[in-house]
């Protein structure tokens, strides 16, 4: 996990570029290699010297070998524009259709204003939402609720590489059937790792 990875650009006037500051600190230690698992964006990889990124599709493959039966999945869901590139790679790797979603967030409050499902889902099936980080989980909870209400999706799973789960899992399980994380930050018997 790369701290401050989501701060890959200043969000407001007078913000520091926190990711750049952190990467400068790591670079000052002169490591011969720095390995990141599923970096939030290419910005973090570019700011670190001698950096290797293990991509999300490789990490997810480790779970599909042991825990997650990818043959049970009918759709890969990209929860926002930032996840499309990685989700596309996963959809292509497992030969599944990609469904792209779009959220609008109020930068001042962090709350999601809107959620739209951009691609049609015409047949019932099981969906896997994929992303790099889950902090509190509101994004995924709102998306899962929209998918269940507005599409014929019958079951929803969530895969995140870095599962912070700062608000626990109870709210997520209101709308999500299975949760998978490569690096969970909490212990919970309902979590698949």
Predicted regions and their residues:
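PRPP-associated nucleotide enzymes
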Residues: 1-193
């Amino acid at each position: 996990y790369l701290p401050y990875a989501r701060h890959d650009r200043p969000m407001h006037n007078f913000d520091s570029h926190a990711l750049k500051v952190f990467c400068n600190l790591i670079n000052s230690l002169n490591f011969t290699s720095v390995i990141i698992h599923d970096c939030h964006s290419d910005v973090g990889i570019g700011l670190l010297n001698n950096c290797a990124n293990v991509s999300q599709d490789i990490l997810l493959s480790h779970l599909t070998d042991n825990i997650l039966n990818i043959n049970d999945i009918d759709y890969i869901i990209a929860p926002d524009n930032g996840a499309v590139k990685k989700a596309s790679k996963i959809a292509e790797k497992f030969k599944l259709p990609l469904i792209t979603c779009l959220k609008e967030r109020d930068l001042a409050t962090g709350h999601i204003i809107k959620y739209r499902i951009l691609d049609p889902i015409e047949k019932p099936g099981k969906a896997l939402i994929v992303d790099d980080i889950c902090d509190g989980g509101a994004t995924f909870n709102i998306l899962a609720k929209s998918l269940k209400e507005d599409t014929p999706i019958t079951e929803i799973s969530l895969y995140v590489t870095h599962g912070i789960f700062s608000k626990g899992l109870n709210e997520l399980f209101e709308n999500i059937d299975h949760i998978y994380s490569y690096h969970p930050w909490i212990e919970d018997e309902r979590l698949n790792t």
